[in-house]
């Protein structure tokens, strides 16, 4: 059980970091396109 946590925690953290970094510029561009109207 502990080994699974040690293995999956960095993977989940990396995926979450990538998703966050992809979402942030996409959200800014979304606001730029649709927020002005």
Swiss-Prot record:
This is Photosystem II reaction center protein Y. NCBIfam families: PRK13240.1 (NF009711). It comes from the Bacteria. The gene is psbY. Belongs to the PsbY family. PSII is composed of 1 copy each of membrane proteins PsbA, PsbB, PsbC, PsbD, PsbE, PsbF, PsbH, PsbI, PsbJ, PsbK, PsbL, PsbM, PsbT, PsbX, PsbY, Psb30/Ycf12, peripheral proteins PsbO, CyanoQ (PsbQ), PsbU, PsbV and a large number of cofactors. It forms dimeric complexes. Keywords: Membrane, Photosynthesis, Photosystem II, Thylakoid, Transmembrane, Transmembrane helix. Loosely associated component of the core of photosystem II (PSII), it is not always seen in crystals. PSII is a light-driven water plastoquinone oxidoreductase, using light energy to abstract electrons from H(2)O, generating a proton gradient subsequently used for ATP formation. It is a single-pass membrane protein. GO terms for cellular component: photosystem II; plasma membrane-derived thylakoid membrane. It is found in: Cellular thylakoid membrane. Coiled coil: none annotated. GO terms for biological process: photosynthesis. The chain crosses the membrane at residues 4-22. One of its GO terms (molecular function) is manganese ion binding. InterPro entries: PSII_PsbY.
């Amino acid at each position: 059980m502990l080994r699974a946590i040690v293995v999956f925690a960095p993977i989940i953290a990396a995926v979450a970091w990538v998703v966050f970094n992809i979402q942030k510029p996409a959200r800014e561009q979304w606001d730029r396109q649709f927020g002005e109207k």
